[in-house]
């Protein structure tokens, strides 16, 4: 299965009538492996800061998590494994695997829990596959 198929079929899938606003799978080096059409353009620096927060939990708390032009307030995640962010009625979930970051962005009516479930389910699967 191609990385794009993982994004299209597993991240952008419908959950209780809703789906993510955007999603991507990005390498630890910041290079996008696959992404949905609405995924924002981001800087390598954005991904470097996210990676640093996985290594040093709390790194993003003072400044927020930036993905392109959007700033998310970092909320409780799982140190070293999952970062969650909130902006208004939407937010972001980032799951770290051995080689990649699985990123999901949501807006209402999708809930944070639905976003977490979609992103973390694929991330856990990739971890099981050694990815």
From Swiss-Prot:
GO terms for molecular function: actin monomer binding; proline-rich region binding. A motif (Involved in PIP2 interaction) lies at residues 81-97. Phosphorylated by MAP kinases. The keyword Disulfide bond applies. It is found in: Cytoplasm, Cytoskeleton. PROSITE patterns: PROFILIN. GO terms for biological process: nuclear migration; regulation of actin cytoskeleton organization. The keyword Cytoplasm applies. The modification Phosphothreonine is found at residue 111. Keywords: Actin-binding, Allergen, Cytoplasm, Cytoskeleton, Disulfide bond, Phosphoprotein. GO terms for cellular component: cell cortex; cytoskeleton. Disulfide bonds join 13-115. CDD domains: PROF. Pollen specific. Occurs in many kinds of cells as a complex with monomeric actin in a 1:1 ratio. The variability of the residues taking part of IgE-binding epitopes might be responsible of the difference in cross-reactivity among olive pollen cultivars, and between distantly related pollen species, leading to a variable range of allergy reactions among atopic patients. Belongs to the profilin family. Binds to actin and affects the structure of the cytoskeleton. At high concentrations, profilin prevents the polymerization of actin, whereas it enhances it at low concentrations. By binding to PIP2, it inhibits the formation of IP3 and DG. This is Profilin-2. It comes from Zea mays (Maize).
């Amino acid at each position: 299965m191609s990385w794009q198929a993982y994004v299209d079929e597993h991240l952008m899938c419908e959950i209780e009538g809703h789906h993510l606003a955007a999603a991507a799978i990005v390498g630890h080096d910041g290079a996008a492996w696959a992404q949905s059409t609405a995924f924002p353009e981001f800087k390598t620096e954005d991904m470097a800061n996210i990676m640093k927060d996985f290594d040093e939990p709390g790194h993003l708390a003072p400044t927020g998590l930036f993905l392109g032009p959007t700033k998310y307030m970092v909320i409780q995640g799982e140190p070293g494994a999952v970062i969650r962010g909130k902006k208004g009625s939407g937010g972001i979930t980032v799951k770290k695997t051995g080689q990649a970051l699985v990123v999901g962005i949501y807006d209402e009516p999708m809930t944070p829990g639905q976003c977490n479930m979609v992103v973390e389910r694929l991330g856990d699967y990739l971890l099981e596959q050694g990815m």
